[in-house]
């Protein structure tokens, strides 16, 4: 797909390019909080009526001159212009470049400084069931990016009775063998329409956090309600952005 929107946070001087579309089909995708049980995972609704040209993206960013540029939305690496835009942001704007969130399908992008990877599962069968893609692709990409010196962070949605403590522990053990200092975020599952899984309790989040801390040094967790997830600006002023290009 392509980028259809650029937002800007003046306080922290960063811009975000928003993509439409994804390569995974995770049934618990948070996009379903807005699109409903029949919504397509990773695809924002409604579909953008137009996409930004590369020239429009560059013109907008040249005016802003942000210190950091994030690429997000569904799975940002499916945007065909991503490599060109990452290079432009690094060479022309001298900005830090980061995949604000990604499923890890493609981290071999020249001029990319860092990425925040959302791992879906540890066990091979569950990973394939959730995403439709093999686990090895994502984990090998992460290891390779780490070896190349990218600044990486990781996260996992904790879903009791699906992506449970055994999945969390497998991932944390893997990360710790690369570096115990990789930032790791446990996201408490937010129930989406059409699935039977429950939001974890406060105690379950605490147990999951302590388990992760037995492997990693930099662990955080979030336990949002549906209302909080749909309005992140109330909790974090980094989400106070304005649309500067696109719709």
Region spans (language model):
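Auxiliary Fe-S-binding modules of radical SAM enzymes
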Residues: 1-14, 62-66, 160-247
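Conserved AdoMet/S-adenosylmethionine-binding subsite of the radical SAM
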Residues: 58-199
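Short, hydrophobic beta-strand segments that form beta-sheet elements in well-ordered domains
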Residues: 17, 96-103, 218-222
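Generic structural hydrophobic/aromatic packing signal, biased to beta-strands
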Residues: 17-18, 26-29, 71, 115, ...
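Residues that define the transmembrane beta-barrel architecture of outer-membrane proteins
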Residues: 53-55
């Amino acid at each position: 797909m392509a980028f259809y929107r650029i937002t800007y946070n003046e306080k922290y001087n960063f811009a975000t390019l928003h993509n439409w579309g994804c390569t995974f089909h995770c049934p618990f995708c948070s996009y379903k909080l807005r699109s409903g049980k029949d919504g397509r995972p990773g695809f924002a609704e409604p579909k953008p009526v137009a996409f930004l040209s590369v020239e429009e993206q560059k013109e907008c960013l040249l005016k802003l001159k942000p210190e950091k540029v994030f690429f997000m939305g569904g799975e940002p690496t499916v945007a065909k212009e991503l490599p060109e835009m990452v290079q432009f942001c690094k060479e022309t704007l001298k900005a830090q470049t980061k995949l604000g969130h990604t499923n890890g399908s493609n981290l071999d992008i020249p001029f990319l400084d860092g990425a925040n990877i959302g791992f879906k599962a540890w066990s091979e069968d569950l990973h394939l069931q959730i995403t439709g893609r093999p686990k090895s692709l994502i984990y090998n990409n992460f290891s390779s990016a780490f070896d190349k010196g990218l600044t990486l962070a990781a996260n996992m949605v904790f879903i009791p009775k699906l992506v449970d403590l055994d999945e969390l522990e497998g991932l944390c053990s893997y990360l710790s063998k690369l570096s115990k200092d990789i930032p790791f975020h446990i996201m408490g599952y937010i129930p989406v329409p059409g699935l039977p899984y429950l939001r974890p309790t406060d105690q379950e989040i605490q147990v999951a956090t302590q388990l992760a801390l037995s492997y990693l040094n930099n662990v955080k967790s979030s336990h949002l309600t549906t209302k909080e997830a749909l309005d992140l600006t109330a909790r974090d002023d980094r989400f106070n952005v304005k649309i500067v290009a696109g719709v």
